[in-house]
Amino acid sequence: MSLTYRDAGVDIDEGDRLVDLIKPHARPTLRPEVLGGIGGFGGLFALDVKKYREPVLVSGTDGVGTKLKVAFAADRHDTVGIDLVAMCVNDIAVVGAEPLFFLDYYATGKLSAEQGAEVVKGIAEGCRQAGCALIGGETAELPGFYARGEYDLAGFAVGCVDRPRIVDGTRVARGDVVIGIASSGLHSNGFSLARKALLDRYPLDHRFEGLGGRTLADALLEPTRIYAKDVLALLDQVPVRAFAHITGGGLPGNVPRTLPDGTRAVLEEKRWPRPAIFDVVEREGQVPRDEMYRTFNMGLGLVAVVAPGDEAAAHAALRARGLEAWTVGAIEAGGPGEATCEVVR
Protein backbone atom coordinates (compact mmCIF):
# COMPACT_ATOMS: atom_id res chain seq x y z
CA MET A 1 0.00 0.00 0.00
CA SER A 2 1.47 3.35 -1.05
CA LEU A 3 1.54 6.35 1.28
CA THR A 4 0.85 9.92 0.21
CA TYR A 5 1.46 13.30 1.80
CA ARG A 6 -2.32 13.64 2.19
CA ASP A 7 -2.35 10.38 4.17
CA ALA A 8 0.16 12.02 6.52
CA GLY A 9 -2.14 15.01 6.98
CA VAL A 10 -0.86 17.54 4.44
CA ASP A 11 -3.16 18.38 1.53
CA ILE A 12 -1.20 20.07 -1.26
CA ASP A 13 -4.32 20.52 -3.39
CA GLU A 14 -6.06 22.39 -0.56
CA GLY A 15 -3.02 24.64 -0.27
CA ASP A 16 -3.16 25.39 -3.99
CA ARG A 17 -6.86 26.15 -3.67
CA LEU A 18 -6.12 28.60 -0.86
CA VAL A 19 -3.62 30.45 -3.06
CA ASP A 20 -6.27 30.82 -5.75
CA LEU A 21 -8.78 32.12 -3.20
CA ILE A 22 -6.46 34.74 -1.71
CA LYS A 23 -5.13 36.24 -4.94
CA PRO A 24 -8.22 38.44 -5.49
CA HIS A 25 -7.78 39.83 -1.96
CA ALA A 26 -4.05 40.49 -2.28
CA ARG A 27 -4.07 41.97 -5.78
CA PRO A 28 -5.77 45.30 -4.91
CA THR A 29 -3.14 46.00 -2.22
CA LEU A 30 -0.23 45.99 -4.66
CA ARG A 31 1.66 49.25 -5.10
CA PRO A 32 3.44 50.43 -8.28
CA GLU A 33 6.78 49.42 -6.73
CA VAL A 34 5.77 45.74 -6.58
CA LEU A 35 7.31 43.56 -9.28
CA GLY A 36 5.42 40.38 -10.09
CA GLY A 37 2.53 38.86 -8.18
CA ILE A 38 1.70 36.40 -5.43
CA GLY A 39 3.25 32.93 -5.69
CA GLY A 40 6.91 33.59 -6.43
CA PHE A 41 9.77 32.46 -4.21
CA GLY A 42 10.33 36.00 -3.03
CA GLY A 43 8.32 39.21 -3.10
CA LEU A 44 9.99 41.90 -5.19
CA PHE A 45 9.69 45.58 -4.30
CA ALA A 46 11.57 48.31 -6.19
CA LEU A 47 12.14 51.07 -3.64
CA ASP A 48 11.81 54.53 -5.17
CA VAL A 49 14.98 55.96 -3.64
CA LYS A 50 14.44 59.31 -5.39
CA LYS A 51 11.77 60.08 -2.76
CA TYR A 52 14.39 60.11 0.00
CA ARG A 53 17.62 61.89 0.80
CA GLU A 54 18.82 59.08 3.08
CA PRO A 55 16.38 56.17 3.00
CA VAL A 56 16.31 54.00 6.11
CA LEU A 57 14.41 50.72 6.05
CA VAL A 58 12.36 49.90 9.14
CA SER A 59 11.05 46.42 9.94
CA GLY A 60 8.56 45.02 12.42
CA THR A 61 7.09 41.63 13.27
CA ASP A 62 4.28 40.60 15.59
CA GLY A 63 1.29 38.33 16.08
CA VAL A 64 -2.27 38.50 17.37
CA GLY A 65 -1.83 36.44 20.54
CA THR A 66 -4.73 34.73 22.27
CA LYS A 67 -7.27 37.03 20.65
CA LEU A 68 -7.26 34.19 18.14
CA LYS A 69 -8.91 31.98 20.76
CA VAL A 70 -11.90 34.32 20.72
CA ALA A 71 -12.01 34.15 16.92
CA PHE A 72 -12.00 30.34 17.06
CA ALA A 73 -14.80 30.25 19.64
CA ALA A 74 -16.90 32.75 17.68
CA ASP A 75 -15.98 31.19 14.32
CA ARG A 76 -15.13 34.64 12.97
CA HIS A 77 -11.92 34.85 10.99
CA ASP A 78 -12.19 37.91 8.74
CA THR A 79 -10.91 40.56 11.18
CA VAL A 80 -7.91 39.00 12.95
CA GLY A 81 -5.88 39.72 9.82
CA ILE A 82 -6.52 43.42 10.38
CA ASP A 83 -5.15 42.97 13.89
CA LEU A 84 -2.07 41.26 12.51
CA VAL A 85 -1.27 44.10 10.12
CA ALA A 86 -2.01 46.73 12.77
CA MET A 87 0.38 45.24 15.31
CA CYS A 88 3.21 45.35 12.79
CA VAL A 89 2.64 48.58 10.88
CA ASN A 90 1.82 50.67 13.95
CA ASP A 91 5.18 49.71 15.41
CA ILE A 92 7.12 50.90 12.37
CA ALA A 93 4.95 53.97 11.83
CA VAL A 94 5.78 55.44 15.24
CA VAL A 95 9.38 56.02 14.14
CA GLY A 96 8.08 57.91 11.11
CA ALA A 97 8.21 55.11 8.56
CA GLU A 98 5.73 54.64 5.73
CA PRO A 99 4.74 50.94 5.59
CA LEU A 100 5.68 49.60 2.16
CA PHE A 101 4.98 45.89 2.14
CA PHE A 102 3.75 43.08 4.34
CA LEU A 103 4.13 39.31 4.55
CA ASP A 104 2.21 36.84 6.67
CA TYR A 105 2.73 33.39 8.17
CA TYR A 106 -0.38 31.25 8.65
CA ALA A 107 0.03 27.89 10.38
CA THR A 108 -2.70 25.35 11.09
CA GLY A 109 -3.10 21.66 11.87
CA LYS A 110 -5.66 20.90 9.15
CA LEU A 111 -5.89 23.38 6.30
CA SER A 112 -9.28 24.78 5.30
CA ALA A 113 -8.95 26.95 2.22
CA GLU A 114 -12.16 28.80 3.09
CA GLN A 115 -11.02 29.62 6.63
CA GLY A 116 -7.57 30.65 5.43
CA ALA A 117 -9.08 32.89 2.76
CA GLU A 118 -11.17 34.65 5.42
CA VAL A 119 -8.01 35.33 7.43
CA VAL A 120 -6.15 36.67 4.41
CA LYS A 121 -9.17 38.79 3.48
CA GLY A 122 -8.62 40.60 6.80
CA ILE A 123 -4.88 40.87 6.19
CA ALA A 124 -5.55 42.47 2.81
CA GLU A 125 -8.00 44.91 4.41
CA GLY A 126 -5.36 45.83 6.99
CA CYS A 127 -2.83 46.41 4.22
CA ARG A 128 -5.34 48.61 2.42
CA GLN A 129 -5.85 50.69 5.55
CA ALA A 130 -2.09 50.99 6.05
CA GLY A 131 -1.29 51.67 2.39
CA CYS A 132 1.16 48.78 2.13
CA ALA A 133 1.33 45.88 -0.32
CA LEU A 134 0.68 42.26 0.62
CA ILE A 135 3.47 40.76 -1.45
CA GLY A 136 3.78 37.26 -0.05
CA GLY A 137 3.43 34.86 2.82
CA GLU A 138 3.69 31.29 3.99
CA THR A 139 0.98 28.74 4.70
CA ALA A 140 2.08 25.83 6.89
CA GLU A 141 -0.11 22.77 7.42
CA LEU A 142 1.26 21.03 10.51
CA PRO A 143 -0.67 17.85 11.36
CA GLY A 144 -1.02 17.26 15.09
CA PHE A 145 0.49 20.62 15.99
CA TYR A 146 -2.74 22.60 16.50
CA ALA A 147 -6.23 21.66 17.66
CA ARG A 148 -8.76 21.19 14.87
CA GLY A 149 -9.99 24.53 13.52
CA GLU A 150 -7.19 26.50 15.18
CA TYR A 151 -4.24 28.35 13.68
CA ASP A 152 -1.55 30.87 14.51
CA LEU A 153 -0.52 34.03 12.70
CA ALA A 154 2.63 36.08 12.42
CA GLY A 155 3.20 39.17 10.33
CA PHE A 156 6.18 41.04 8.96
CA ALA A 157 6.14 44.66 7.80
CA VAL A 158 8.83 46.72 6.12
CA GLY A 159 8.72 50.48 5.72
CA CYS A 160 11.00 53.37 4.92
CA VAL A 161 11.75 56.74 6.48
CA ASP A 162 14.12 59.51 5.48
CA ARG A 163 16.87 59.62 8.09
CA PRO A 164 16.26 63.30 9.00
CA ARG A 165 12.57 62.47 9.63
CA ILE A 166 13.14 59.59 12.05
CA VAL A 167 11.08 60.09 15.22
CA ASP A 168 13.19 58.73 18.07
CA GLY A 169 12.24 60.80 21.12
CA THR A 170 15.62 62.46 21.52
CA ARG A 171 14.09 65.95 21.28
CA VAL A 172 11.54 65.36 24.04
CA ALA A 173 11.95 67.98 26.77
CA ARG A 174 10.46 68.94 30.10
CA GLY A 175 7.18 70.80 29.57
CA ASP A 176 6.23 68.97 26.38
CA VAL A 177 2.61 67.98 25.95
CA VAL A 178 1.40 64.36 25.81
CA ILE A 179 -1.53 63.71 23.47
CA GLY A 180 -3.43 60.44 23.67
CA ILE A 181 -5.20 59.08 20.60
CA ALA A 182 -8.22 56.83 20.99
CA SER A 183 -8.02 53.08 20.63
CA SER A 184 -10.88 51.05 19.18
CA GLY A 185 -10.97 48.81 22.26
CA LEU A 186 -8.66 46.12 23.61
CA HIS A 187 -6.73 45.97 20.32
CA SER A 188 -4.60 42.78 20.45
CA ASN A 189 -3.09 42.73 23.93
CA GLY A 190 -4.15 41.36 27.28
CA PHE A 191 -6.51 38.73 25.91
CA SER A 192 -5.33 36.00 28.25
CA LEU A 193 -6.48 38.20 31.14
CA ALA A 194 -9.66 39.34 29.38
CA ARG A 195 -10.63 35.77 28.53
CA LYS A 196 -10.00 34.63 32.10
CA ALA A 197 -12.05 37.52 33.48
CA LEU A 198 -15.02 37.08 31.15
CA LEU A 199 -15.24 33.87 29.17
CA ASP A 200 -15.05 31.47 32.10
CA ARG A 201 -18.49 32.79 33.15
CA TYR A 202 -20.17 34.43 30.17
CA PRO A 203 -20.98 33.21 26.65
CA LEU A 204 -19.77 35.19 23.67
CA ASP A 205 -23.31 36.29 22.84
CA HIS A 206 -23.75 37.92 26.28
CA ARG A 207 -24.60 41.63 26.14
CA PHE A 208 -23.18 43.72 28.96
CA GLU A 209 -24.72 47.09 29.73
CA GLY A 210 -22.54 49.84 28.33
CA LEU A 211 -21.39 47.98 25.22
CA GLY A 212 -23.96 49.71 23.02
CA GLY A 213 -25.98 46.58 22.38
CA ARG A 214 -22.98 44.67 21.07
CA THR A 215 -22.26 41.12 22.14
CA LEU A 216 -19.14 40.20 24.05
CA ALA A 217 -17.75 38.66 20.86
CA ASP A 218 -18.32 41.93 19.00
CA ALA A 219 -16.50 43.94 21.66
CA LEU A 220 -13.59 41.53 22.03
CA LEU A 221 -13.05 41.07 18.29
CA GLU A 222 -13.19 44.78 17.43
CA PRO A 223 -10.17 45.18 15.12
CA THR A 224 -7.05 47.00 16.24
CA ARG A 225 -6.95 50.54 14.90
CA ILE A 226 -4.31 51.13 12.23
CA TYR A 227 -2.61 54.49 12.76
CA ALA A 228 0.00 54.40 9.98
CA LYS A 229 -1.57 56.94 7.61
CA ASP A 230 -2.62 59.13 10.55
CA VAL A 231 0.95 59.26 11.87
CA LEU A 232 2.33 60.26 8.48
CA ALA A 233 -0.35 62.91 8.00
CA LEU A 234 0.35 64.36 11.44
CA LEU A 235 4.10 64.45 10.78
CA ASP A 236 3.47 66.40 7.58
CA GLN A 237 1.98 69.20 9.69
CA VAL A 238 3.56 68.98 13.14
CA PRO A 239 7.13 68.16 14.25
CA VAL A 240 6.08 65.40 16.66
CA ARG A 241 8.90 64.65 19.08
CA ALA A 242 7.88 61.11 20.02
CA PHE A 243 5.22 58.49 19.42
CA ALA A 244 4.40 55.38 21.42
CA HIS A 245 2.25 52.48 20.22
CA ILE A 246 0.44 51.24 23.33
CA THR A 247 0.57 47.45 23.29
CA GLY A 248 1.57 44.85 25.90
CA GLY A 249 2.75 46.64 29.02
CA GLY A 250 0.18 49.40 28.58
CA LEU A 251 0.98 53.07 29.07
CA PRO A 252 3.56 52.54 31.87
CA GLY A 253 5.45 50.01 29.76
CA ASN A 254 5.38 51.66 26.35
CA VAL A 255 5.54 55.44 26.80
CA PRO A 256 9.01 55.30 28.45
CA ARG A 257 10.37 53.39 25.44
CA THR A 258 10.31 56.61 23.43
CA LEU A 259 11.46 59.06 26.14
CA PRO A 260 15.03 60.15 26.91
CA ASP A 261 16.56 59.13 30.23
CA GLY A 262 15.87 61.57 33.02
CA THR A 263 12.30 62.32 31.95
CA ARG A 264 8.90 61.06 33.01
CA ALA A 265 5.46 61.33 31.49
CA VAL A 266 2.73 62.19 34.00
CA LEU A 267 -0.73 61.35 32.68
CA GLU A 268 -4.04 62.22 34.33
CA GLU A 269 -6.63 59.46 34.05
CA LYS A 270 -9.56 61.89 34.18
CA ARG A 271 -8.50 63.55 30.92
CA TRP A 272 -9.72 60.83 28.57
CA PRO A 273 -12.78 58.55 28.39
CA ARG A 274 -12.30 54.81 28.66
CA PRO A 275 -14.26 52.42 26.39
CA ALA A 276 -16.74 50.33 28.37
CA ILE A 277 -15.04 47.01 27.60
CA PHE A 278 -12.22 47.95 29.98
CA ASP A 279 -14.68 48.62 32.78
CA VAL A 280 -16.35 45.27 32.10
CA VAL A 281 -13.04 43.39 32.32
CA GLU A 282 -12.00 45.27 35.46
CA ARG A 283 -15.33 44.75 37.22
CA GLU A 284 -16.10 41.17 36.25
CA GLY A 285 -12.54 39.96 36.78
CA GLN A 286 -11.94 42.06 39.89
CA VAL A 287 -8.70 43.18 38.25
CA PRO A 288 -6.76 45.85 40.19
CA ARG A 289 -6.54 49.17 38.35
CA ASP A 290 -2.73 49.09 38.31
CA GLU A 291 -2.88 45.65 36.66
CA MET A 292 -5.31 47.01 34.08
CA TYR A 293 -2.84 49.75 33.17
CA ARG A 294 0.06 47.28 32.96
CA THR A 295 -1.91 44.99 30.66
CA PHE A 296 -4.23 47.04 28.42
CA ASN A 297 -4.10 50.28 26.43
CA MET A 298 -6.99 51.62 28.58
CA GLY A 299 -8.46 53.60 25.69
CA LEU A 300 -5.28 55.12 24.22
CA GLY A 301 -3.80 53.16 21.35
CA LEU A 302 -1.24 55.78 20.40
CA VAL A 303 0.52 58.56 22.29
CA ALA A 304 2.25 61.58 20.74
CA VAL A 305 4.59 64.04 22.45
CA VAL A 306 4.74 67.57 21.03
CA ALA A 307 6.11 70.95 22.06
CA PRO A 308 3.53 73.17 23.82
CA GLY A 309 3.40 75.49 20.82
CA ASP A 310 2.38 72.61 18.54
CA GLU A 311 -0.44 71.28 20.72
CA ALA A 312 -3.29 73.09 18.93
CA ALA A 313 -2.00 72.20 15.47
CA ALA A 314 -1.64 68.55 16.46
CA HIS A 315 -5.22 68.39 17.70
CA ALA A 316 -6.47 70.08 14.53
CA ALA A 317 -4.58 67.61 12.35
CA LEU A 318 -5.94 64.63 14.28
CA ARG A 319 -9.50 65.96 14.11
CA ALA A 320 -9.11 66.35 10.36
CA ARG A 321 -8.28 62.63 10.24
CA GLY A 322 -11.44 61.80 12.18
CA LEU A 323 -9.54 60.72 15.29
CA GLU A 324 -10.51 61.38 18.87
CA ALA A 325 -7.57 62.73 20.86
CA TRP A 326 -7.00 64.43 24.20
CA THR A 327 -4.16 66.21 25.94
CA VAL A 328 -3.59 63.66 28.69
CA GLY A 329 -0.46 64.88 30.44
CA ALA A 330 2.97 66.42 30.23
CA ILE A 331 6.65 65.60 30.39
CA GLU A 332 8.43 66.33 33.66
CA ALA A 333 11.94 65.88 34.97
CA GLY A 334 12.52 62.34 36.18
CA GLY A 335 15.15 60.34 37.98
CA PRO A 336 18.64 59.98 36.56
CA GLY A 337 19.33 57.19 34.10
CA GLU A 338 15.75 56.16 33.36
CA ALA A 339 12.49 57.21 31.76
CA THR A 340 9.12 56.47 33.36
CA CYS A 341 5.39 56.98 32.92
CA GLU A 342 2.95 57.54 35.77
CA VAL A 343 -0.84 57.56 35.49
CA VAL A 344 -2.37 59.79 38.18
CA ARG A 345 -5.86 58.81 39.30
From Swiss-Prot:
Q: Which branch of life, at top level? A: Bacteria
Its catalytic activity? 2-formamido-N(1)-(5-O-phospho-beta-D-ribosyl)acetamidine + ATP = 5-amino-1-(5-phospho-beta-D-ribosyl)imidazole + ADP + phosphate + H(+)
Keywords of the record, alphabetical order, are: ATP-binding, Cytoplasm, Ligase, Nucleotide-binding, Purine biosynthesis
The top EC class is: ligase
Which subcellular locations apply to this protein? Cytoplasm
Any one GO MF term held by the record is: phosphoribosylformylglycinamidine cyclo-ligase activity
Q: May I have one GO cellular component term? A: cytosol
Documented EC number(s): 6.3.3.1
What the entry lists under InterPro entries is as follows: PurM-like_C_dom, PurM-like_C_sf, PurM-like_N, PurM-like_N_sf, PurM_cligase
* Keyword Protein biosynthesis among record annotations: no
User: What pathway annotation does it carry?
Assistant: Purine metabolism; IMP biosynthesis via de novo pathway; 5-amino-1-(5-phospho-D-ribosyl)imidazole from N(2)-formyl-N(1)-(5-phospho-D-ribosyl)glycinamide: step 2/2
- Coarsely, its chief localization is cytoplasm
In its keyword annotation, does this UniProt entry include Transferase?
Answer: no
Swiss-Prot/TrEMBL GO biological process terms = 'de novo' IMP biosynthetic process; adenine biosynthetic process
Pfam families for this protein: AIRS, AIRS_C
List the Gene3D superfamilies hit by this protein, alphabetically: PurM-like C-terminal domain (3.90.650.10), PurM-like, N-terminal domain (3.30.1330.10)
Q: Which family does it belong to?
A: Belongs to the AIR synthase family.
Database matches in HAMAP family: AIRS
Q: What is this protein called?
A: Phosphoribosylformylglycinamidine cyclo-ligase
Q: Which gene encodes it?
A: purM
